[in-house]
């Protein structure tokens, strides 16, 4: 077989095949380096003596009192011996060449799509409003205040209100926003008592959840102590603090609110194209009154992580989902119309695969709030 035929079969150039043959001439095939890099040693690679010293320090420092033997500790030790010690990256490469790295290299996987735990949001068929609090902002010579923030996932419609953290102060803000911008399909919250209601009683559905249900908005509560699902609103919280709180010195609550309103207006103007391309929002009536004793209708969604027995805790109760799904995320849809809870398995690696794990009977007592 000719060089040209081999090159065509393996998909490389003819010169590459010639170089391989030249390198293997008179040698065993398992001892030959067929890499495409230039032969020889890189000009900026650490010398063999320094590489040997790095390996020795790795072993010595591991047995030292501190027990710190990473690249930073090795470089600190080399600073006392060399005028120009190698960088952290060079030390790590030397350790890798000698097989002295005992940690497994972290596999970085692509992030799942926005709103991946809600199929309609992931497919951009529905909008999601994310709510959160920035707590304990100290006005100069004034009170401690909190900031209620909201950002829509697809349209980036933002709002921020300076207030005292309570359900009574939060409800009018939600109503005013939705009367102006329209109703989303979903509203997402963390598990704060202001949003979810009391945690120490069973079957409790708070006033904010009842507001959403009566407006046809599905409340979504993210899992406690989990990262990722609140990234959109937490990123906006950091942006607001950097661009408003840290840049200006407000002497009163009204002045801070005015500064915030000015920033929100500028932010909305900059993201107008995103809002126009976002999923449609339903109009809300200008005359709405919350009825806390009305029968619960619609769905309430809890994203939770199961325990070692495949159980989840929500609404002050414990539910068995699946023993084959321990320590994993599930989306629990509490359906008040059909008296059941549907539990779907969630995986960040495969966001489109959300199998139904269990359908649990559940009937809410529909007790009015006091």
PLM regions and their residue ranges:
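C-terminal, beta-rich DNA-binding module of retroviral/retroelements integrases
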Residues: 264-370
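Short, polar/flexible loop-turn hinges at active-site or ligand-entry regions and domain interfaces
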Residues: 61-64, 81, 245-254
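Basic, flexible linker segments flanking DNA-binding modules
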Residues: 28-128, 279-287
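Double-stranded DNA-binding cores of transcription factors and transposases
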Residues: 1-25
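Mobile genetic element proteins and their domesticated derivatives, centered on retroelements
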Residues: 6-7, 17-20, 54, 74, ...
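RNase H-like two-metal-ion nuclease catalytic core shared by retroviral integrases
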Residues: 189-190, 195-242, 253-256, 261
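Mobile-element integrase/transposase regions
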Residues: 48, 84-85, 95-151, 157, ...
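Short, solvent-exposed loop/turn segments at secondary-structure boundaries
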Residues: 66, 161-163, 197-202
